[in-house]
Amino acid sequence: MYGSIWSSKNKILLAGATGYLGRFITEKLVEKGYDVRAVVRNKDKINLKAQNLTILEAQVTQPETLKNICENIDVVISTIGITRQKDGLTYMDVDFQSNVNLIDEAKKEGVKKFIYISVLNGEKLRHLKICEAKEKLGDYLKSSGMDYCIIRPNGFFSDMKDFLNMAKTGKVYLFGDGKLKLNPIHGKDLAKEVANAIRNDKKEINIGGPDLLSQNEIAELALRAYKKPIKIIHLPDWIRKLALWSVRTFTSAKTYGPIEFFMTTMVMDMEAPQFGNHKLEDFFNDEAT
């Protein structure tokens, strides 16, 4: 269907170009020859220069700064979202409303397609603050009338640094028996699939890295990266539940949002279709040196 519509001459707007994933997507789109318009809060934070790359400053939380930003654009890609709430902004302010601002502007300018980066299993995790905003945005995008693709990645390699931080001390702590599995993905591999989504007709894509690993196996990789003896401490789940109750009761959503997400996904299988060729073991070894 899309072969006759999409080409490297298409104009792509990327929102969130200076984030971890956004940098890899920018590089991939430029490499593929697309005419790329990268939207950033601060131009100084993006170093890539290319003839087919234009850098624009805008505040996606302020719709007045987005006026005409989608003019002559064919596809919008948004990685906009926050892990930790800051600047007084909530998940609803950023993950939801900022992307609504982009969708509305894109629709007004006749953009053909909107690609949104969400999170794996977000549909099952709507009760979590982070996922509530992302899923509400997904619902809004689906009802917008625009062609769309929602990409749901597993955790990034960079999210696995908690394992490394523990391994550096000589012990890794896990909730439960450590047998639950996940396949985190490198930003470079995910960027490749995001670029592919421009030209296919998939509406939703679940995606993870090439290696499906148990939490025990990830802990072992982290300990080996630091050449430490394998020492994994398995904590009973009541400790996790108590900690989760405590942060929800005694801290603000600003503080507990990322903690409740981490603690909830730690007791879930987070398995996604395998993609890419970057290995978590290599990432850990590089980080540990």
Stretches with model-predicted labels:
Residues L21, V76, L190, V194, ...:
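Non-catalytic, hydrophobic alpha-helical segments
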Residues S158-N165, N196-I205, K228-I230:
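Glycine/proline-rich active-site loop of Rossmann-fold NAD(P)-dependent oxidoreductases
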Residues K181-K188, I207-A225, W238-L244, H278:
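Substrate-binding strand-loop-helix patch
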Residues I5, D237-T289:
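A hydrophobic C-terminal alpha-helical subdomain
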Residues Y2-K32:
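N-terminal Rossmann NAD(P)H-binding glycine-rich loop of SDR-like oxidoreductase domains
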Residues G176-A197, K203:
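Substrate-positioning beta->alpha
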